[in-house]
Amino acid sequence: MRGRLCVGLHLMSTTSRSTLMIVGLGNPGSEYETTRHNIGFMVVDAFAAAVDEQWTHPSSLFDEARTRYAGIEVVLIKPLTYMNLSGKAVAKRSRELGISPTRVVIVTDEYNFPVGKLHLKQGGSSGGHNGVASVIDELETANFWRLRCGIDRRFGPGELVEYVLAPFDASQKDDLAAMIDRGCEAIRQIAKLGPALAMQKINTNGS
């Protein structure tokens, strides 16, 4: 019995090291596709298209696409729970696959950065982001990674919700496209190097 348990724990730890989960935060539905809050969906959609992988629907909580890149399995997740309950999908799938929170990267919007800026960090508070807060609550740790994508801060008091649920400005089209491309490259670097080693490169080139 002890031998079986040790083998099981070894397999789980191996899976945790070799599998990377990339979670794009956003809201499901065509009405939200181009909104600022959905930049996470945009990045993982673009990466899935770049590696020619299709999305599947293994759970009512999320869509998923899988690929192998740089010798590891990369699991892409889009929660279908709406932003404020995103953590339910992240917790369910990461536990099913035995993926440690330190191998989970959340791709999310950040209004404190201009459009085009990317920044990778591990841990910390939610920064008032309800999707990130939900992931912290459901994983019972803040020790996952966040790839934060700038959406700019063009709103006044009481206008945050309306702002994040509105599309990017037409004048930001080129910066948005470049940021999505760099988001895909960031995922490649994280897969190749691991988040800790990729962080400096991503943040140096994050504009």
Predicted segments with their positions:
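Short, loop-centered acidic/histidine patches that primarily coordinate divalent metals
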Residues: 149-152, 168
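The feature captures the short pre-catalytic strand/loop hairpin that immediately precedes
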Residues: 158-168
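Nucleotide and nucleotide-moiety/phosphate-recognizing core
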Residues: 2, 7-123, 133-147, 154-159, ...
